[in-house]
A protein has these predicted regions:
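Mid-domain, small-residue-enriched loop/turn segments at the edges of structured enzyme/sensor domains
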Residues: 6-66
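Structured C-terminal helix/loop/strand segments within mature extracytoplasmic catalytic/sensor domains
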Residues: 11-13, 63-166
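Extracytoplasmic
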Residues: 3, 26, 47, 52, ...
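Acidic/histidine-rich, surface-exposed loop or edge segments in extracytoplasmic proteins
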Residues: 1-2, 136
Length: 166
């Protein structure tokens, strides 16, 4: 939830927040926020200066699962434990959604705001484990939050995708 993330970053403060993002090597690590708005602490990751690709998201998840982020073992375990889990064709899927909107200035389109949805996490089935990052950007205006839709489609497709990778 956005408000909760903003409360955490406020409590961390600018220097500690920027330090963690840098130590985590999270995306482009730019937490400055929107130019002239002094909002990096509460908005840098919301369609602003902090950017990350699907590949970088998957690498981050791999590091989380391997306990390789610069935090305690307890912090790794707690983070893994609080992510929601879902079932999909025998797979147990753990992940987090994200939704934002891309406007004309960001995507250079004339169709107004478009919804962007993430679903990032990992899945286990028997002895197999995978990490994933699914990013979907609507091709036209949409008022529906894209993150939950992205998750639903991914969960439906996962069994077939995983079978093809064998």
């Amino acid at each position: 939830m956005l408000w909760f993330s903003q409360e955490i970053t406020r409590r961390l403060g600018n220097e500690r927040f920027a330090g963690y993002v840098s130590k985590f090597d999270y995306g482009n690590t730019d937490v400055a926020g929107n130019a002239g708005k002094n909002d990096g602490l509460t908005r840098s990751w919301v369609n602003s200066s902090l950017e990350i690709s699907p590949v970088e998201q998957a690498i981050f998840m791999r590091r989380l699962l391997a306990g390789e982020l610069p935090v305690s073992d307890k912090a790794h375990a707690m983070t893994r434990a609080i992510l929601p889990s879902f079932r999909a064709g025998g797979w147990t899927v753990h992940g987090k959604t994200g939704t934002t909107r891309l406007g004309d200035s960001a995507d250079k389109r004339s169709d107004g705001w478009r919804s962007l949805g993430w679903f990032v996490g990992w899945a286990n089935k028997d002895s197999r484990s995978i990490v994933f990052a699914r990013l979907v950007i609507d091709t036209k205006r949409s008022d529906t939050p894209k993150g939950p839709q992205t998750r639903a489609v991914f969960l439906k497709e996962l069994p077939n995708l995983a079978d093809k990778s064998n």
